[in-house]
Amino acid sequence: MNTFSQVWVFSDTPSRLPELMNGAQALANQINTFVLNDADGALAIQFGANHVWKLSGKPDDRMIEDYAGVMADTIRQHGADGLVLLPNTRRGKLLAAKLGYRLKAAVSNDASAVSVQDGKATVKHMVYGGLAIGEERIATPYAVLTISSGTFDAAQPDASRTGETHTVAWQAPAVAITRTATQARQSNSVDLDKARLVVSVGRGIGSKENIALAEQLCKAIGAELACSRPVAENEKWMEHERYVGISNLMLKPELYLAVGISGQIQHMVGANASQTIFAINKDKNAPIFQYADYGIVGDAVKILPALTAAFAR
């Protein structure tokens, strides 16, 4: 048996739902999708859900992962085994841990490939900081996986599909975190995993002010702006949501233009699936040139304005 009888899907990030649903179609005979509202439920059916389970009644001061109890109860009531697919977001991983405990299931994070043999999931994901690919065969009846972005192609909606909708009522967990206040986060983040063209800056750009040069190039060619982890986490020059690497974004654009990025393996794991990699770096021995299809050795502060001017003609 090369499929599960049932798969259960949930995404706290709507943009990740299409790829999870496409993976579900390949891995199971029946697809169940947990959603938070009617609009997401209708979309899930178009993506192939046989059953939609709308999570309802959570107080505004509680977290989404507090639905784990009723989700696990629903899963157990409809089969003695099954596969759970979640995005590898922070909230997805929190929910995976809670579901794994309640279902007595093995949990595997950041899956980059999933297959089913004899009713058991085999999962591949990066290990040793991206230096190798590990493979796990999950022996527990239930398997809970968080899926890396780009593991599956996005499912295409089909308005002719039909499915059944059910309601799952909130049940307060015995122990929970209560939100007492919220603060809006200033962020201009985009869905970088959907971008065709990406310009990504590293500390070699020199300063936060010089990032404007990369932004101008983005406008000229219609690209999205990303960065390396040190730019976001250490220097605080850009938002966390924009950094590319093994612990965050895994991109597959048509073009990845790396500006002032050294090319350490932890970063390149998130970029080396790009169709074309173009590197700009002052250091001719930078590791990035081992991955690049094209490269320029030189000062990005001088090269970026020249590229922008050339594309603007």
Curated annotation (Swiss-Prot):
Keywords: Electron transport, FAD, Flavoprotein, Transport. Pathway: Amine and polyamine metabolism; carnitine metabolism. Gene3D superfamilies: HUPs, TPP-binding domain. The keyword Protease does not apply. InterPro entries: DHS-like_NAD/FAD-binding_dom (IPR029035), ETF_a/b_N (IPR014730), ETF_a/FixB (IPR001308), ETF_asu_C (IPR014731), ETF_asu_C_CS (IPR018206), FixB (IPR023461), Rossmann-like_a/b/a_fold (IPR014729). FAD binds at residues 255-283. GO terms for biological process: carnitine metabolic process; fatty acid beta-oxidation using acyl-CoA dehydrogenase. One of its GO terms (molecular function) is electron transfer activity. Signal peptide: none annotated. Required for anaerobic carnitine reduction. May bring reductant to CaiA. Heterodimer of FixA and FixB. Belongs to the ETF alpha-subunit/FixB family. This is Protein FixB. It comes from Escherichia fergusonii (strain ATCC 35469 / DSM 13698 / CCUG 18766 / IAM 14443 / JCM 21226 / LMG 7866 / NBRC 102419 / NCTC 12128 / CDC 0568-73).
